[in-house]
UniProtKB/Swiss-Prot annotation:
EC nos: 2.4.1.18
Pathway stated in the Swiss-Prot or TrEMBL entry: Glycan biosynthesis; glycogen biosynthesis
A Gene Ontology BP annotation from the UniProt entry: glycogen biosynthetic process
Subunit structure, as described in the record: Monomer.
InterPro entries found in the cross-reference section: A-amylase/branching_C (IPR006048), Branching_enzy (IPR037439), GlgB (IPR006407), GlgB_N_E_set_prok (IPR044143), Glyco_hydro_13_cat_dom (IPR006047), Glyco_hydro_13_N (IPR004193), Glyco_hydro_b (IPR013780), Glycoside_hydrolase_SF (IPR017853)
GO cellular component, as recorded: cytosol
Gene Ontology MF, one: cation binding
Domain of life: Bacteria
Lineage: Bacteria, Pseudomonadati, Pseudomonadota, Betaproteobacteria, Rhodocyclales
Active-site residues (renumbered): D302 (nucleophile), E355 (proton donor)
Catalytic reaction list: Transfers a segment of a (1->4)-alpha-D-glucan chain to a primary hydroxy group in a similar glucan chain
Functional summary from the UniProt entry: Catalyzes the formation of the alpha-1,6-glucosidic linkages in glycogen by scission of a 1,4-alpha-linked oligosaccharide from growing alpha-1,4-glucan chains and the subsequent attachment of the oligosaccharide to the alpha-1,6 position.
Annotated keywords: Carbohydrate metabolism, Glycogen biosynthesis, Glycogen metabolism, Glycosyltransferase, Transferase
Listed name of the protein: 1,4-alpha-glucan branching enzyme GlgB
Amino acid sequence: MQHADALYLFNEGRNNQAYRLLGAHADISGTTFRVWAPNASRVSVVGDFNGWHGDVHQLHPLGESGVWEIAVAEAHTGNLYRFEITNRHTGDKLIKSDPYGRGFELRPGSAAYVVPPSMHVWGDADWLQQRAGWDWQQAPVNIYEVHPGSWMRHPDGKPYLWGELAERLIPYALAQGYTHLELLPITEHPLDESWGYQTTGYFAPTSRYGSADELRAFVDACHQAGLGVLLDWVPGHFPQDDWALARFDGTALYEHEDPRLGLHADWGTHIFNYGRHEVRSFLMSSAHWWLSEFHFDGLRVDAVASMLYLDYSRKHGEWLPNKFGGRENLEAIDFLKQLNAMVHGDFPGALTIAEESTAWPMVSRPTYVGGLGFSMKWNMGWMNDSLRYFHRDPIYRRWHHSELTFGQIYAYSENYVLPFSHDEVVHGKGSLLGKMPGDTWQRYANLRLLLAWQVLTPGKKLMFMGCEFGQQGEWSEGRELDWGSLANPENAAAQRLSADLNRLYRDLPALHTQDFSALGFEWIDCNDSEHSVLSWLRWGKDGSFVVVVFNFTPVPQPAYRLGVPEAGTYVELLNTDSAFYGGSNLGNGGALTATKGEWMGRPANLEVTIPPLGAVVLRRE
């Protein structure tokens, strides 16, 4: 693409590869710098190649585009640099990092450096070809959510680099039965405590874990091992650091001038101005960059609800309505549709997943039928109802039975992911294990039940690291997971159960081929609130089925009669109360016989022993 065409599309909000134009581009003759600063009277590049003096290398404007350019023979790969921008209205001089910078010095430093062209040779062509033809809606999608800096660390507390992480994380995730990793934001960010959600480098992998090529090698290794990698991406807001995007050229360039439109009071961050064409090109190009240059398999888009509503977390008088008088952010809606159309069009098989917590309709429906175009949406309602129910003492659960059954009313209105994410194990909420009631045995039994509840309920899955083995304390970004707890038999048993549940979900068509269809789920009995028992069938597209039975109290239910579709032998595929998983080992001897005879409106019936705080999965032989 010629520069004139690239500039035109950039100003039109339709340049999805603006990273080829803007930023720092090195070659044998030096480095060319370009930056968008339409309200500047002067722009200089300052760096360690010119003593950080603004008078040495002044950029020249490229017509009326607002973009400035200079070729600097003295600047080469590895050189640090910033932009010195003089506002045309006030004369104020601002020292800014490069919005399109591809690498930054390690915090607390914030200067960008000139990044060399990638030398990584990709070996994942087979993976990408397979992904392009992947019918993900009928496939098992089981996501392990990971904060790379705190999953596991060196004994001295230093985080692993990408290569070291690959050696440990990839085999672990595969052994646990996950299909994808989802990395909390690894875009550059100054504050560890933000977990990456306050991004300052939308085109730069954080320097905490190594170079850009080391990240490429990590993703490549995942793909060659059969593991997908999703990126948590944050287009909803950005931090107020004065050296970054905020008031970039002395004006509200990437954000809105009016705080009623441009400020997130909850997070102390700025909201992008999605109606500004160049901001649209910036964000679209960021998404394209990660999927193209790093081969990520999709994006989990953070805080979508905050983007959709102009009155999000605002009181009356603290927000401005749209041109129709409504509270919908029309520009953000249009941006999200454009984003999803680009991802699905340019990267076949790549996923987009919305963290969206409201009842906004058709989030995961195609744009051509009026939807936002996401592949999937987190089911926050299911997650909240489930955790609320499991937190209750079993003696009271009979009066809250609907907290578990209500989700099926809307379960197929979207393509849902069932998440137990990082947000549920921080800020005083306790760990998943810590939310469970009862004595030690009951707490672990409830945790096993919760793990099974997620996997056996229709929907794709997401589990935050550490939850799979019942970490006792809250997660902290400042330390590694409590791997030492696996010396505790209960934690090791929970880890085994999690792996077996994941493999069951992966291997049984009945548990994944109709995750998004009401045809894949059928209640056997959802009304036994007196005993806090639920039972259902999961159906595969191939006609296969499994019987699922849950007992949410510590009282065993022997000889519990259920109606089933067919007479014959039913094998007990999984029992969360097995001694292998730390349970009391109450079960069904491995198999049951269903006899002909109508029960619950079905032609056959069987009597199953449902263990205390246990779940059983049965399959007709």
